[in-house]
Amino acid sequence: MERWRLLRDGELLTTHSSWILPVRQGDMPAMLKVARIPDEEAGYRLLTWWDGQGAARVFASAAGALLMERASGAGDLAQIAWSGQDDEACRILCDTAARLHAPRSGPPPDLHPLQEWFQPLFRLAAEHAALAPAASVARQLLAAPREVCPLHGDLHHENVLDFGDRGWLAIDPHGLLGERTFDYANIFTNPDLSDPGRPLAILPGRLEARLSIVVATTGFEPERLLRWIIAWTGLSAAWFIGDGDGEGEGAAIDLAVNAMARRLLD
């Protein structure tokens, strides 16, 4: 706080991975983020590398700490989706992903390989039959990736915010490197994973509608996108199971979307 001459400007938020505090640097509002786990630092490096293009700007960084732009707008993608405008929310997420994946002039920073990110799924699939189809699909996709680029890794309604005149921008990347199709898979399980009490992603017809929008926006092959959705939902369910919450709402949402995607693929 002293080094960057910051003043506290709100309540401290604690997550499993970070401490996040609204601050001011002179007249400038900002967010101070301090990592609680080493994995966060790849995301810090990626956010810095994006340099405000499609993502929040980074004003300063140090070991385990990041001073970043604060969202100033009143828009909320989850509320937009719940209000009957899910198609519009989906398009905003697609546009944000496209900006993040656009070529940059310099080489990317050191990031987590997507193959390593999927290890929890591969470990647990041998013990949990419900995860086996996703693990099989993930292995096939990871063995022959396409359009490899830096990935956000957690691109959903809560991580794309309204920055006023700067538009919708991403925050909180995991910092991965892999096939860009993966970054779109998270759209298909949210905002339900953030608020299971307000189902949307699992409603009849929603997966098909979102699939149509993403394919039209990106040019992806529908079958390959469905396979990445299957892989992603398996990984997400594996995380819940690994945390001892395999019977909870989060894993149930993942497995429901997984089953819908497999039916469409068949």
Swiss-Prot record:
It holds the Pfam family APH_6_hur. The active site is at residue 154. It catalyses: streptomycin + ATP = streptomycin 3''-phosphate + ADP + H(+). Keywords: Antibiotic resistance, ATP-binding, Kinase, Nucleotide-binding, Transferase, Transposable element. The keyword Membrane does not apply. One of its GO terms (molecular function) is streptomycin 3''-kinase activity. Its EC number is 2.7.1.87. GO terms for biological process: response to antibiotic; secondary metabolic process. It is an enzyme of class 2 (transferase). It comes from the Bacteria. The aminoglycoside phosphotransferases achieve inactivation of their antibiotic substrates by phosphorylation. Belongs to the aminoglycoside phosphotransferase family. This enzyme is encoded by the kanamycin and neomycin resistance transposon Tn5. This is Streptomycin 3''-kinase. The gene is str.
